[in-house]
A protein has these predicted regions:
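Signature of N-terminal electron-transfer/Fe-S-associated modules in redox systems
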Residues: 1-147
Length: 147
């Protein structure tokens, strides 16, 4: 991966995403290892992690449900969608279901303003959602995750 980027610092975000996909979250050990390999301080790595909402230092569920509540989504029902997901999954912001299948996050923007309200589950976008539509989305992931 290093050969595709001009500097070691520029490979940090893709490397963090790869490590997180492999391990499930960015543990202290992963952060230390990446900092050493990329010749960065652990503080440099942690600063980048804290900036991006898709990166986490805590274990998440198999499916990370990110509900956008920025202005476009908010005006079209994003907050109500978040509340609906909280009730449906039985968890709140930054929570994980007891079976480890779902995590839920409120996020500021996922770049899908034209299709608001929108939710991102892992790397998949779901747009123009209603409570009924998000129920179907969550049920589909639930079935897939239990197979």
């Amino acid at each position: 991966m290093l050969t595709h980027y001009p500097t070691k610092r520029s490979v940090l975000v893709p490397t963090l995403l790869y490590a997180q996909d492999e391990v499930g979250f960015l543990s202290d050990e992963v952060i230390s290892e990446l900092a050493g390999r990329l010749e960065l301080t652990e503080l440099d790595v942690r600063n980048v992690i804290s900036y991006y909402s898709m990166l986490t230092t805590r274990p998440r569920g198999k499916y990370n449900v990110q509900v956008c509540t920025n202005i476009a989504c908010l005006l079209r029902g994003g907050e109500e969608l978040l509340e609906h997901c909280e009730r449906k999954l039985g968890i709140r912001h930054k929570g994980t279901t007891s079976d480890g299948l779902f995590s839920l996050e409120e996020v500021e923007c996922i770049g899908a303003c034209s299709w608001a309200p929108a939710v991102q589950v892992n790397y998949d976008f779901h747009e123009n959602l209603t409570p009924e539509k998000i129920d179907r989305v969550l049920e589909d992931y639930g079935r897939k995750g239990r197979q």
